[in-house]
Amino acid sequence: KAEPYRTEGGKAANTMRIVFMGTPESAVPSLQRLLADGHEVVAVWTQPDKPAGRGDKMHSPAIKDFALQHGLPVEQPRKIKTDEAKELFASYGADVAVVVAYGRILPAEFLRAPRRGCINVHFSLLPQYRGAAPANWAIVNGETRTGVTTMFIGAELDAGPILLQHETMIGEIETTPELMQRLSFIGADLLSETLAQLDHLTPRPQHARDATFAPLLTRQHGLINWLSTAATIERCVRGFQPWPTAYPHPNSRRLIIW
């Protein structure tokens, strides 16, 4: 029998067998919180190491570094739709899979494997800003508030039933890295609360008519439109950090505006 842990409110809850799937620094607080809450993280899945920076040296994802420091088994498959990947994922016998900015859409076999489903921590107030870059686009579009959503993952991207949400204001001069740092810790707390209350939560369906989208960023997004208002340009400077950044001319390679 699993030993109970205590939530911040003092309520005991049973630990779970969890597969964690995430990649960037913003996913680390959620994994850290799962360990602090006493859950059994049976595997950590993340993206493969990639070349970056000067000299294109290979860099590992932040989640991989954290997981290895804590003795957790790490998987970095280049493809997840193979029979081998599906069989490995199912073999864990997980209660839940937790996904935080993993960077890939899970196949149906993955969604069916955990006993209690796959839970996503998404950095917006769904159904607003579905997609890969919600914090960036919230700032660029001049939103004054955003938040974090926990949800069950379904077949459609970021459209699954909502479990819990937490709203926060966006600072007038806040950049995307600053906002994401806050949201990552809000997300960790919300994930902890979600798992502790999972037996008592009623998932709420999203309404497609209310959905807005946060598409994947490209370098072209950072090109400043000098016909825009000063306020719009200022939001782009804050919102397109740390990439693609705001730059003044299509041929700009070194001049970056922060």
Regions found by a protein language model. Give the residues of each.
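N-terminal Rossmann-like dinucleotide-binding module
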Residues: 15-54
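Short, low-complexity intrinsically disordered segments enriched in A/P/G/S/L with frequent Arg
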Residues: 2-5, 10-13
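Internal alpha/beta domain cores that form substrate/cofactor-binding pockets in large enzymes
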Residues: 17, 42-43, 73-92, 105-123
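Internal anion-binding site segments
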Residues: 208-258
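Amphipathic, non-transmembrane alpha-helical secondary structure
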Residues: 28, 32-36, 86-90, 108, ...
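Donor/substrate-binding cores of folate-linked one-carbon enzymes
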Residues: 37, 47, 96-213
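N-terminal glycine-/serine-/threonine-rich beta1-alpha1-beta2 phosphate-ribose binding loop
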Residues: 47, 51-95
